[in-house]
Swiss-Prot record:
The keyword Glycoprotein does not apply. Disulfide bonds: none annotated. Part of the ribosomal stalk of the 50S ribosomal subunit. Interacts with L10 and the large rRNA to form the base of the stalk. L10 forms an elongated spine to which L12 dimers bind in a sequential fashion forming a multimeric L10(L12)X complex. SMART domains: RL11. This is Large ribosomal subunit protein uL11. Forms part of the ribosomal stalk which helps the ribosome interact with GTP-bound translation factors. The gene is rplK. It comes from Verminephrobacter eiseniae (strain EF01-2). Belongs to the universal ribosomal protein uL11 family. One of its GO terms (biological process) is translation.
Amino acid sequence: MAKKIVGFIKLQVPAGKANPSPPIGPALGQRGLNIMEFCKAFNAQTQGVEPGLPLPVVITAFADKSFTFIIKTPPATTLIKKAIKLEKGSASALSTKVGKITRAQLEEIAKTKMKDMNAANVDAAVRTLAGSARSMGVTVEGL
């Protein structure tokens, strides 16, 4: 018989830096899950990833206090900022432009994000990412 699911917890956790402090501790503690077990497993699975890169994680909590988790690809905005070496996006995206990104860079990001994106092909994913870049105040070239 399958385990009974009691809930899902969605968090963004820096790669290799999971610890029991907020937001992880309170979120897992509410469901009665073993916080240190999650932290150790998450840090072990994210060893090969750039430390500190925020990774979305979906934790499935079961009735017997066990859990499983799925680590997704980093957010598109984080990958865009990393590609053009930005600290943060523009406060007013329409009037203040903070950088430029090329179609080739967007294609590279799209290939990374493809498994988590709701796009039929790489071209559709590139257009989606271009919209995200524009909303951050980044000029998209070659699109």
